[in-house]
Amino acid sequence: MLIRHAPDLTDNDVTGHGLYLRRRDFIGGAAGLGLMAAAGSASARGLTYGPGFSTTEAPTPKKDITSYNNFYEFGVNKEDPSENAGSLKTRPWTVRVDGECEKPATFAIDDLIKGNKLEERIYRMRCVEGWSMVIPWVGFPLKDLIAQVKPTSKAKFVAFETLMRPSEMPGQRWDTLQWPYREGLRIDEAVHPLAILAVGLYGDVLPNQNGAPLRLVVPWKYGFKGIKSIVRISLVETMPATAWNVLAPREYGFYSNVNPAVDHPRWSQATERRIGEFRRRETLPFNGYGQYVADLYRGMDLKRNF
């Protein structure tokens, strides 16, 4: 069950001792990675809690979130990212935002952290493979970054691109997917307040294996839509190609909304295995966020537009 909308609560209403400690740890972790400017800004602003969209479900243990991952740039097995992602250098790092906009710009990752109001969002994550987690992300709304570049009326979609650096991302040396990894959203999906760019989890700086230093989180969609280690965001007029849709278009659609009524060709999507639980649980339409996002797809055939 989701708790109240953000306007109904203030940070003071919900900030307990545990959140305070995670806030402090995140600031300290950021400083430890050379983010002194960002850390100072975070200290002044505080890390706010986004209660309006956060679930009350217990978060998955951090050790599971950081050791059970899909990140094919570091290998195809679940343990590969945590074992191999240490080779990735996340500083210096820039993100180019361009395309159909009035003010294209290149942002240093530290400036993005410093210049945006960071929130903790506790979201469900449902993998297309049939397992799920609950993850306490730290990030900021994607719409805030898009607004900075002033999109034009031609901006109908948003395309995302991961870093291409085979020397540090060994999985890119193999043609498992068409590299670099690409993803996309419709513009109205991208500016929905649920969609965030994450820079941390559990109050700490985002681990490499979870998509450092910047990843997309779209909780009503299957996890592979959450592109990791982003270096480019482009506002475009036509639907962009996406990695898994290019590889297997009959199995992975562009939208990839969580839908228990639409099975993967090789397995059911009706239930899921929550990491750490024994029994399977029913999968919720839109991963339980339908009250917020279902109107985006009003009148669409969701089986055809999977």
Curated annotation (Swiss-Prot):
Binds 1 Mo-molybdopterin (Mo-MPT) cofactor per subunit. Predicted to be exported by the Tat system. The position of the signal peptide cleavage has not been experimentally proven. Belongs to the MsrP family. GO terms for biological process: protein repair. Heterodimer of a catalytic subunit (MsrP) and a heme-binding subunit (MsrQ). It holds the Pfam family Oxidored_molyb. PROSITE patterns: TAT. This is Protein-methionine-sulfoxide reductase catalytic subunit MsrP. The lineage of its organism: Bacteria, Pseudomonadati, Pseudomonadota, Alphaproteobacteria, Caulobacterales. Its main location: periplasm.
